[in-house]
């Protein structure tokens, strides 16, 4: 090989290497077609289907346009109501809030799959465990059976989910085996999973399990129990003013503080009825709309993320 040919080969290799690096270094924002530095936000309502009060508040907020994404709890008593709404709003951004626990004292739910196929997931009464500490062992194979059952029921009732997430993060933050079970099911149904880089440090198996085509958000924000009720708007305003470039999801829990929701959640103040009313009030307020405009924050949905994952 002549010196000039060697030089050309080396230059070509360098160019190919640079090109490949650029592809892999491309941020999620760029994959979505936005300029680097753009602040993109998903305002995501959890727990739809749990009660009528949650469904009513969330759907009103979705119609107002400031809450623009949600996920549905298939095993819960009020899922049929929200499934009908999702079916009649096919352009809406509705994921499935994959559910394997039933944390309420008196307001309970259980698996979609037959109990005898998922015995490790239920208590002696056939409900999901209040907490997984109650179960001696959660069988990952049974988890997959139940996840498929929840997705299939949603599909049968006319819901076309845009993404998957996990109630109480049970499938995300309880080890690689369960996360991999969720990821296998997600890939089977060609659905993105809500995962954020914020979680990688504490749960390194997440990054190890994810492939190059999986969607990974940059940041997530959710309010914590130590925030006093009077400081609720301040917490969210500070978070929005300090929003970093990239794709962030605000995980919120809207609902109406009424007799139904107070009865369903009466054993706890965190994520209870008044908590959910505060979330609803802030995210439907003019104050929220104004700061979005002031900070040049653009709302996006999981539909856009799914298209990016497909390369469309």
Residue spans of the language-model regions?
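C-terminal domain-boundary segment and adjacent tail
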Residues: 193-196, 268-312
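Active-site beta-loop-alpha junctions enriched in small/polar residues
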Residues: 48, 75, 97-103, 167-169, ...
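Structural preference for beta-strand elements that scaffold enzyme active sites
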Residues: 40-42, 67-71, 91-97, 161-165, ...
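A short alpha/beta connector and helix-capping loop motif
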Residues: 53-77
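Active-site gating loops and adjacent loop-to-helix segments of metal-dependent hydrolytic enzymes
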Residues: 109-134, 264-271
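Catalytic domains of cell-wall/extracellular-matrix polysaccharide-remodeling enzymes
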Residues: 140, 144-232, 241, 281
């Amino acid at each position: 090989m002549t010196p000039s040919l060697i030089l050309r080969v080396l230059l070509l290799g360098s160019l190919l290497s640079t090109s490949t690096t650029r592809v892999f270094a491309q941020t999620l924002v760029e994959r979505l077609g936005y300029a680097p530095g753009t602040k993109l936000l998903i305002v995501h309502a959890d727990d739809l289907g749990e009660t009528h009060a949650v469904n009513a508040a969330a759907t009103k907020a979705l119609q107002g346009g400031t809450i623009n994404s949600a996920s549905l709890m298939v095993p819960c008593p009020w899922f049929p109501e929200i499934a009908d709404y999702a079916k009649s709003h096919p352009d809406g951004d509705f994921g499935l809030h994959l559910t394997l626990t039933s944390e309420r004292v008196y307001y309970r739910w259980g698996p979609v799959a037959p109990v005898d196929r998922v015995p490790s997931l239920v208590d002696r009464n056939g409900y999901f465990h209040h907490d997984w500490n109650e179960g001696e062992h959660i069988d990952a194979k049974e988890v997959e059976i139940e996840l498929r059952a929840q997705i299939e029921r949603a599909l049968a009732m006319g819901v076309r989910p845009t993404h998957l997430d996990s109630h109480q993060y049970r499938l995300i933050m309880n080890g690689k085996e369960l996360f991999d079970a969720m990821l296998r099911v997600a890939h089977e149904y060609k659905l993105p999973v809500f995962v954020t880089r914020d979680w990688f440090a504490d749960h390194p198996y997440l990054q190890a399990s994810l492939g190059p085509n999986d969607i990974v958000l940059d940041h997530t924000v959710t309010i914590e129990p130590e925030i006093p009720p009077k400081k609720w708007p301040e917490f969210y305003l500070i978070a929005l003013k300090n929003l970093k470039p990239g794709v962030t999801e605000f995980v919120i829990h809207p609902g109406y503080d009424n007799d139904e929701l107070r009865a369903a959640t009466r054993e706890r103040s965190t994520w209870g009825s008044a908590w959910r009313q505060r979330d609803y009030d802030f995210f439907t307020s003019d104050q929220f709309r104004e700061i979005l405009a002031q900070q040049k924050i653009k709302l996006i949905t999981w539909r856009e993320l799914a298209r990016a994952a497909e390369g469309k």
